[in-house]
């Protein structure tokens, strides 16, 4: 890709700007430019699309997204050391890269939307799950984004796509299964990063379901939190604080079942009975 976009190799960029990855920021820089292109392509067509990227670091994925024709990239980076490297990319693609120095957990993402939006990110490990939940829980649906193509630790990716009776099924699987169609795209080995993480990563692609089962996000969160907080117990016990057997009877669910056996539809039924 260095030849494709005319920019220097990422290793040179990192060395020139002194960008050692900070563990406190959950940073692992992805240096394999073939992989950054693969992530960007997984998102689908990027022409006429604004892409929001969180944690671009030295900009390997940013470069891939711009090279594949995104109308604009809005990159949110809290590490000020990375800003000069990103500014060089912005100079190479005039008017197509907006850089915001901020904590992604504090950003109003919907306000950044300018026409169709795709979120593409190698998310910092320490905030990735919380950001995903934030993007899934707005009151209005469909959301401001057309799709999300995100990298997580593989264990988190498995939780995102898990369904009932899967060992990885939990609150995240219910939430993602309720409002999105989610799939695992491909794995990324530790050696693709600097420094190499101790675990394999995976890219997950999510698209919003146009008309999910009507249900209050806050109440669904409350039900899944109670049910999976004691996942090995029968529902009559784990849901006791929310009404226990009376709630389950109202929803038509056997009180002897356990949380991991319930479908997304059944969790929504419980939430709607509260």
UniProtKB/Swiss-Prot annotation:
GO molecular function: 16S rRNA (adenine(1518)-N(6)/adenine(1519)-N(6))-dimethyltransferase activity; RNA binding
Coiled-coil boundaries: none
Reactions mediated catalytically: adenosine(1518)/adenosine(1519) in 16S rRNA + 4 S-adenosyl-L-methionine = N(6)-dimethyladenosine(1518)/N(6)-dimethyladenosine(1519) in 16S rRNA + 4 S-adenosyl-L-homocysteine + 4 H(+)
Single GO cellular component term: cytosol
InterPro entries named among the record's database cross-references: KsgA/Erm, rRNA_Ade_diMease-like_C, rRNA_Ade_Mease_Trfase_CS, rRNA_Ade_methylase_Trfase_N, rRNA_adenine_dimethylase, SAM-dependent_MTases_sf
Matching Pfam families: RrnaAD
Keyword Phosphoprotein belongs to the record: no
Matches recorded under Gene3D superfamilies: Ribosomal RNA adenine dimethylase-like, domain 2, Vaccinia Virus protein VP39
Compartment annotation: Cytoplasm
Amino acids binding S-adenosyl-L-methionine: 28, 30, 55, 77, 103, 122
Main location: cytoplasm
Keyword field: Cytoplasm, Methyltransferase, RNA-binding, rRNA processing, S-adenosyl-L-methionine, Transferase
Broad enzyme group: transferase
Keyword presence, Membrane: no
EC numbers: 2.1.1.182
Similarity-based family: Belongs to the class I-like SAM-binding methyltransferase superfamily. rRNA adenine N(6)-methyltransferase family. RsmA subfamily.
Role noted for this protein: Specifically dimethylates two adjacent adenosines (A1518 and A1519) in the loop of a conserved hairpin near the 3'-end of 16S rRNA in the 30S particle. May play a critical role in biogenesis of 30S subunits.
Name of this chain's protein: Ribosomal RNA small subunit methyltransferase A
């Amino acid at each position: 890709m260095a030849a494709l976009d005319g920019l220097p190799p990422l290793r040179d960029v990192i060395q020139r700007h002194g960008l050692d990855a900070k563990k406190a920021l959950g940073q692992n820089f992805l240096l394999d430019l073939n992989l950054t292109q693969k992530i960007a392509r997984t998102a689908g067509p990027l022409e006429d699309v604004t892409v929001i990227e969180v944690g671009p670091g030295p900009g390997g994925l940013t470069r891939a997204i711009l090279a594949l024709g995104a109308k604009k990239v809005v990159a949110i980076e809290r590490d000020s050391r990375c800003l000069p490297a990103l500014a060089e990319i912005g100079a190479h693609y005039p008017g197509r890269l907006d850089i915001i120095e901020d904590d992604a957990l504090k950003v109003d993402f919907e306000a950044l939307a300018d026409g169709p939006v795709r979120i593409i990110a190698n998310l910092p490990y320490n905030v990735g799950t919380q950001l995903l939940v934030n993007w899934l829980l707005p009151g209005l649906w469909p959301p401001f984004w057309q799709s999300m193509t995100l990298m997580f630790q593989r264990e988190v990716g498995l939780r995102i796509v898990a369904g009932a009776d899967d060992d990885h099924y939990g609150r995240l699987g219910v939430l993602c299964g309720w409002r999105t169609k989610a799939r695992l795209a491909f794995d990324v080995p530790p050696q693709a990063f600097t420094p190499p993480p101790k675990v394999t990563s995976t890219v997950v692609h999510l698209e919003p379901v146009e008309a999910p089962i009507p249900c209050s996000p806050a109440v669904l969160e409350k039900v899944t939190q109670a049910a999976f907080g004691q996942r090995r117990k029968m529902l009559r016990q784990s849901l006791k604080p929310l009404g226990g057997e009376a709630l389950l009877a109202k929803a038509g669910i056997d009180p002897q079942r356990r949380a991991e056996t319930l479908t997304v539809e059944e969790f929504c039924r419980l939430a709607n009975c509260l």
